[in-house]
């Protein structure tokens, strides 16, 4: 780099997306041979865009334009504190404190390091992690149904953060008033007496969560948002109604506060903000489980001190025991002081465009790291391991791309090897982030869109939803390239409903039930039309993909909530407030309880092996459960949701009784009846996709299964009884997920995992190696060896992609060994350039050696000439 060129561009519009600005920046940069930094101006905002360039690998005289990095929407007045800090850090004076700047090359490197999103993410995670471990010592959540106080407070605090971070993103979009997070303005809203009290959390946050975001706006439903009525004659007319405001005495002017600060916030739905305090009836006796503690009773034990949110003073605390350090000082400050120091973006960064701001993907990382502070598999705390196992973005992107290519290539027509290779190249171009047009003909486009609509993906250990989000965003991008105006995608959704109507006419004999159901389906066509007409193209793509294609299981209910959070944010990003319209033109969030379930995915409840006996019962159940789930997904009215929940519970009870009559094991039938998918606190002790989703199999299973050593598996005896062919008493937990994936897949379905690589060579991996060699078609095996994918972990890893299909005798698969010293930014290029092939039949059961034929021949010669260690005395 010998020089820089700066350009300023004044745009006419008021609002530009990151992608729009990135595309403009790329087009302008194409015209110049030297780096160009562009300053966009529009509507009193400024965006700075820098395009990363690298030398073309084939033509060294040309550059390839890669990622566009932006400091976006800098206000020219009342500039965000985080933007001021970023711009100050880019000054020559500030750069010179850390770097020697004596050329454009060194200046470029210093700027790149300063704008590195990874460094920003690390800084934020460090601050939030410190805050979390400071707060955990100060909060008290009600006992609920969790006896362990440490676990209860950990989960309660993570749940609080989940809700609050979503609210913060809403604030960034202008949907919630800044005043509710401003310590100075809050003194005029609520009564603060002592920073150790919980006035802020109770009066502002709980009323915001449960009585505002979970309640329709007053202008749409009169008197919906109000304080609960006074208790008279020991009668509480609004007892246990958690959608009404509480803590009236904490406000200076309660008669005004709703209209001034809460009335114009849109209703969200979606379950994220439902109060978890519940009433249960057992033997005609009512009792109450308090989890959120949304109550102004004097005996409410809930405590979340105000200083955790509002303190602006940095203080030193001792976290050495938690982090496994010695004599180190850690700094903490109030949560809002931390959040105000960073800029947030609701759009997830991609490999080709990123904003210097915190995006939802980072939040997945943060929450998954915090979840690691309590391990439900081992029932032990492992706080110093926090941050070990979150799958890096580049690994997620790679696994997502390869899974989609493996799925879609089998959907496209081809008759020769050359045609298949040609289709694969076209698919890679389709998935690659580029402004080049795709190369598929109209017939192939229709096939691809139909295949995407039929796609079923599950992550059986979804954690914070990294893979599900990665798949969602990549499929949205594919649909954008194949069908830029959503014409075909819209028609696909309407065709789906028309098929259901046709099936309903044939299968339902009761005329009234039939016509009622058909009318509901016709209404849903109108809803589809409205969605596509009124909302952003990407919103319509995401909504129907989430409904039809995306499924997740995790043993931690709070992990399911975090996955929901990320999916919800992805829908929020494509919506904008419209004054005067119902709910400000914001479409309420869907209900995801029927797509994301808390369960032990490794413990099956088998129906399939008795299908000949129960076939009719099961088919009838699947038909009804799918209809319930379709209706529930988009239901917004609380009364309607309660009605659907009750009807589904009745269906499961009837299904359970039918199974019992047919000699199905009584305890398993009871498990089906007792399972409640709508309770965000419960964990199903079993997993069965038919019962939970109305599905028998999936096209893609993708996961980063939990890393739990065999001696710490709490339910090893259940695994032994669950019929796993690969069971070994010394196997680590992740190995069972391989066989689980195989069972969940349809024929030719794809499994893509990243796990420890011990199974490739260890004795406990023998059965797994044999199982995969005999029953699957390996496609890709990547051995990372000493290369640390998980930066704060010492686990050596591998990625494997296989098809559920018997391998032909000459079947070849791709493999690569990653050197330990490879730089992370060079990983994707290394994978592309260094893949080799190996015959699957040459893999030996006692150890898988990933090497080309020359190495394998040498290994064979050595083994023939030598004497195995086990044969020595």
Model-found features: residue ranges?
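Signature of N6-adenine DNA methyltransferases within the class I
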Residues: 33-37, 43-95, 99, 109-140, ...
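Long recognition/docking surfaces used for binding and targeting
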Residues: 235-376
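Class I S-adenosyl-L-methionine
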Residues: 99-173, 177-178, 320-541, 545, ...
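Class I S-adenosyl-L-methionine-dependent methyltransferase module
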Residues: 100-103, 172-178, 452-454, 458, ...
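Catalytic micro-motifs at enzyme active sites that drive phosphoryl/nucleotidyl and oxygen chemistry
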Residues: 23-28, 445-447, 537-540, 582-585, ...
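Short, compositionally biased low-complexity segments
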Residues: 1-2, 87-108, 175-183, 278-314, ...
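Generic amphipathic alpha-helical segments used as scaffolds and interaction surfaces in large
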Residues: 111-123, 144-152, 156, 192-196, ...
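Short Lys/Arg-enriched alpha/beta "domain-start" segment
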Residues: 1-28
């Amino acid at each position: 780099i010998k020089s820089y060129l700066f350009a300023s561009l004044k745009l006419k519009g008021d609002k530009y997306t990151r992608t729009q600005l990135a595309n403009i920046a790329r087009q302008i940069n194409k015209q110049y041979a030297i780096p160009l930094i562009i300053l966009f101006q529009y509507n009193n905002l400024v965006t700075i865009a820098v395009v990363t360039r690298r030398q073309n690998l084939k033509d060294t005289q040309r550059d390839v334009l890669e990622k566009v990095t932006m400091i976006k929407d800098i206000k020219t007045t009342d500039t965000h504190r985080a933007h001021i800090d970023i711009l100050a850090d880019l000054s020559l004076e500030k750069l010179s404190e850390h770097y020697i700047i004596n050329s454009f090359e060194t200046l470029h490197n210093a700027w790149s390091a300063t704008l590195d999103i990874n460094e920003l993410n690390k800084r934020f995670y460090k601050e939030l992690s410190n805050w979390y471990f400071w707060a955990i010592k100060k909060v008290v959540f009600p006992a609920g149904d969790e006896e362990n106080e440490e676990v209860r407070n950990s989960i309660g605090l993570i749940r609080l953060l989940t809700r609050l971070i979503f609210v913060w993103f809403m604030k960034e979009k202008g949907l919630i008033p800044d005043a509710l997070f401003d310590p100075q303005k809050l003194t005029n809203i609520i009564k603060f007496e002592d920073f150790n009290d919980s006035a802020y959390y109770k009066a502002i946050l709980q009323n915001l969560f449960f009585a505002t975001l979970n309640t329709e706006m007053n202008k749409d439903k009169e008197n919906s948002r109000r304080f609960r009525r006074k208790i008279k004659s020991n009668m509480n007319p609004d007892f246990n109604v958690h959608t009404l405001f509480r803590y009236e005495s904490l406000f200076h002017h309660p008669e005004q506060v709703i209209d001034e600060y809460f009335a114009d916030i849109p209703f969200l739905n979606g379950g994220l903000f439902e109060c978890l305090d519940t009433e249960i009836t057992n033997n005609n006796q009512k009792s109450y489980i308090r989890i959120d503690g949304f109550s102004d009773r004097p005996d409410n034990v809930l405590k979340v001190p105000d200083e955790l949110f509002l303190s602006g003073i940095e203080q030193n605390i001792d976290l050495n025991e938690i982090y496994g350090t010695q004599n180190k000082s850690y700094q903490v400050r109030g949560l809002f002081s931390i959040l105000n120091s960073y800029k947030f973006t609701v759009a997830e960064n991609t490999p080709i465009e990123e904003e210097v701001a915190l995006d939802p993907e980072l939040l997945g990382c943060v929450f998954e790291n915090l979840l690691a502070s309590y391990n439900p598999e081992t029932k032990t705390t492992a706080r110093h391991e926090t941050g070990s196992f979150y799958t890096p973005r580049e690994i997620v992107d790679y696994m997502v791309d390869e899974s989609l290519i493996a799925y879609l290539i089998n959907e496209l027509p081809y008759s020769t090897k050359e045609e298949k290779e040609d289709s694969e190249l076209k698919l890679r171009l389709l998935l690659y982030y580029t402004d080049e047009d795709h190369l598929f003909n109209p017939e192939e486009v229709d096939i691809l869109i139909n295949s995407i609509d039929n796609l079923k993906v599950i992550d059986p250990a979804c954690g914070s939803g990294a893979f599900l989000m990665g798949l969602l965003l990549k499929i949205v991008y594919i649909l954008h390239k194949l069908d830029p105006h959503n014409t075909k995608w819209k028609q696909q959704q309407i065709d789906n409903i028309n098929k259901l109507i046709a099936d309903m006419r044939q299968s339902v004999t009761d005329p009234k039930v039939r016509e009622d159901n058909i009318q509901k389906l016709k209404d849903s066509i109108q809803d589809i039309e409205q969605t596509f007409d009124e909302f952003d193209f990407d919103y319509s793509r995401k909504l129907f993909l989430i409904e039809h294609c995306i499924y997740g299981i995790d043993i931690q209910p709070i992990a399911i909530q975090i996955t929901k959070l990320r999916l919800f944010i992805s829908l929020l990003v494509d919506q904008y407030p419209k004054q005067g319209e119902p709910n400000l033109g914001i479409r309420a969030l869907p209900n995801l309880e029927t797509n994301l379930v808390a369960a032990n995915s490794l413990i099956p409840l088998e129906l399939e092996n008795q299908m000949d006996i129960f076939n009719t019962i099961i088919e009838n159940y699947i038909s009804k459960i799918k209809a319930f789930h379709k209706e529930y997904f988009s239901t917004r009215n609380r009364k309607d949701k309660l009605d659907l929940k009750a009807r589904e519970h009745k269906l499961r009870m009837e299904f359970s009784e039918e199974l019992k009559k047919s000699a199905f094991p009584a305890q398993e039938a009871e498990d089906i009846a007792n399972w409640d998918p709508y309770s965000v606190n419960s964990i199903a002790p079993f997993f069965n996709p038919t019962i939970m989703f109305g599905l028998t199999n999936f096209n893609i299973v993708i996961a980063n299964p939990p890393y739990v050593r065999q001696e710490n598996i709490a339910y090893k005896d259940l695994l032994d009884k669950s019929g796993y062919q690969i069971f070994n008493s010394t196997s680590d937990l992740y190995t069972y997920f391989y066989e689980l994936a195989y069972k969940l897949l349809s024929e030719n379905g794809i499994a893509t995992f990243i796990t420890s690589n011990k199974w490739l060579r260890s004795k406990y991996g023998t059965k797994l190696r044999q199982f995969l060699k005999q029953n699957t078609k390996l496609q890709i095996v990547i051995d990372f060896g000493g290369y640390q994918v998980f930066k704060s972990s010492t686990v050596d890893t591998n990625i494997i992609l296989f098809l559920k299909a018997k391998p032909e005798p000459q079947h070849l698969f791709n493999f690569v060994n990653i050197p330990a010293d490879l730089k992370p930014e060079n990983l994707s290029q290394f994978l592309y350039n260094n893949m080799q092939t190996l015959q699957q039949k040459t893999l030996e059961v006692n150890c898988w050696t990933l090497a080309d034929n020359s190495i394998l021949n040498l290994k064979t010669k050595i083994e023939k000439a030598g004497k195995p260690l086990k044969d020595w005395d």
